[in-house]
Amino acid sequence: IVGGVEAVPNSWPHQAALFIDDMYFCGGSLISPEWILTAAHCMDGAGFVDVVLGAHNIREDEATQVTIQSTDFTVHENYNSFVISNDIAVIRLPVPVTLTAAIATVGLPSTDVGVGTVVTPTGWGLPSDSALGISDVLRQVDVPIMSNADCDAVYGIVTDGNICIDSTGGKGTCNGDSGGPLNYNGLTYGITSFGAAAGCEAGYPDAFTRVTYFLDWIQTQTGITP
C-alpha cells in the first residue's frame, strides 16, 4: 500500500497473508472459517500456500497469528494472465480456523458501490516504489472508486469483472497487495489485481476483481453467498 497509513493492529481481522511456494507473497480475505478469497495470479501454478491469519507485523511471531498450510485451491477456469481477466481464486483450509478477536470472516456484497465512494484497500505490499520489500506491518489507504470507463481508458483491458480506484497523488495498492481486499462498510468489494507498470506511486488507477461479478462462481466453489 502506497500513500497510506499503518492499520490499527487486527482492525481488519479477515486480512490473510499468503506465502506461496515459499517464494511469492500475496494477500487474501477470510470469507468463512475454511475459505480464503484471493487473486488467480497469486495461485496460478502454485503447489502450496502458507496462510497466515491474525497478523499485524508479518515478520514477527505474534500471539494472535495462526498459520495453516493448504494445497487445496481453485483458480478461475477462465483466468487469462495476458489480459488479467477472471483474476480470482479460492483456497480451502484443511481445518476450519478458530475465529478470535484477531481472526474474523468478511461478508460479500450483493450490490456494488458507486463511483466516488471512498473505499479502503489493505495489505503488506510495498509501501513505496523505492521499498526493497513488503511492509512489516499491515497498511491501509482511503481512495475513491472511479468509473470503469475512465479506468479502461488507461489500460484497455478493464471489463465488467473489474472495479477500479483513483490513485491520484500516489495512493493505492502495490506489489505484494495482490489478492487482498477492497474494504467498505464491513464487506469486501474487490480483490487487488493489477496496477501500472510505471509504478505504484505514479497516480495511475489500480484495478481489482469485482466481487459482485463473481458471486455465482464463489457460490459454486464454496457455497458462500452474500
Curated annotation (Swiss-Prot):
Disulfide bonds join 26-42, 151-164, 174-200. Its EC number is 3.4.21.32. It catalyses: Hydrolysis of proteins, with broad specificity for peptide bonds. Native collagen is cleaved about 75% of the length of the molecule from the N-terminus. Low activity on small molecule substrates of both trypsin and chymotrypsin. This is Brachyurin. The active site is at residues 41, 87, 178. It is an enzyme of class 3 (hydrolase). It holds the Pfam family Trypsin.
